[in-house]
């Protein structure tokens, strides 16, 4: 799915403040999450396929995004070209994972989610695949911008499952889309206008599996460092069965 938004002529807005943390879950031996935090691009990748394989897969896609950054930040590039670059980057990430799997058979089956937001010319570009999430807090209203690529979300979309039944569903963690080196991917690429004061949250499902939107929204109304620490603390208080990565960024005017 792809929605484009043309250049918006207004006061240039950027990520004026960013805070983040990544922690190991209480039932995990290592952290398979990877993250990217820069002035213009934020991303969370949640690896799967065993600790070693999952960590390699998530790190691989983050490294691909880092390699893409200089091109994305070229001031002569327009937003449509940036959207094309982000969209095509999914193929190169997936190919890189496939190449690693071919060279190391013990890693076949590894994979990762990817949820990223890029901010250029006061336009926010969301690139999403899997069940990590992106939220926007505007005032006191929180909105999920990403859409889970999971079996249970498909059932909800089809009207065959109620959202309050997710926690007990045997396939609650089954993904329908992930970067696993198997091609045939349909990432979400969406564009949003931003407002000064907007806050954006990127997180792995280690957070959203145990916290609801009301808890997330309340925590995000604190200063950014406190917001991140509160979200992590609440996750641990809820049992933290999975690794948890949280990035919170606020929109402000360029200096």
Question: What residue spans do the PLM features occupy?
Answer:
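PP2C/PPM-type serine/threonine phosphatase catalytic domain
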Residues: 2-255
């Amino acid at each position: 799915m792809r929605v484009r938004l043309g250049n918006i002529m207004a006061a240039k807005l950027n990520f004026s403040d960013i805070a983040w943390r990544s922690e190991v879950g209480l039932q995990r031996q290592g952290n398979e999450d990877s993250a990217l935090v820069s002035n213009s691009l934020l991303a969370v990748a949640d690896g799967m396929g065993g600790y070693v394989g999952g960590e390699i897969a998530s790190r691989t896609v983050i490294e691909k995004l880092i390699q893409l950054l200089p091109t994305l930040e070229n001031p002569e590039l327009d937003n449509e070209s940036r959207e094309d670059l982000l969209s095509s980057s999914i193929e190169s990430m997936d190919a890189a994972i496939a190449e690693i799997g071919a060279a190391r058979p013990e890693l076949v089956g590894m994979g990762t989610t990817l949820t990223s937001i890029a901010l250029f010319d006061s336009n926010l570009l969301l690139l999403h695949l899997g069940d990590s999430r992106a939220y926007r807090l505007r005032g006191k209203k929180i909105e999920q911008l990403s859409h889970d690529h999971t079996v249970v979300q498909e059932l909800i979309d089809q009207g065959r499952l109620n959202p309050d039944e997710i926690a007990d569903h045997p396939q609650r963690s089954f993904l329908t889309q992930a970067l696993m080196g198997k091609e045939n991917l349909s990432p979400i690429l969406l564009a949003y206008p931003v407002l000064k004061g907007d806050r954006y949250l990127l997180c792995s499902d280690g957070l959203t599996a145990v916290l609801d939107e009301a808890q997330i929204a309340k925590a995000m109304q604190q200063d950014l460092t406190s917001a991140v620490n509160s979200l992590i603390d609440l996750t641990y208080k809820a049992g933290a069965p999975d690794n948890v990565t949280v990035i919170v960024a606020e929109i402000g005017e360029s200096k």
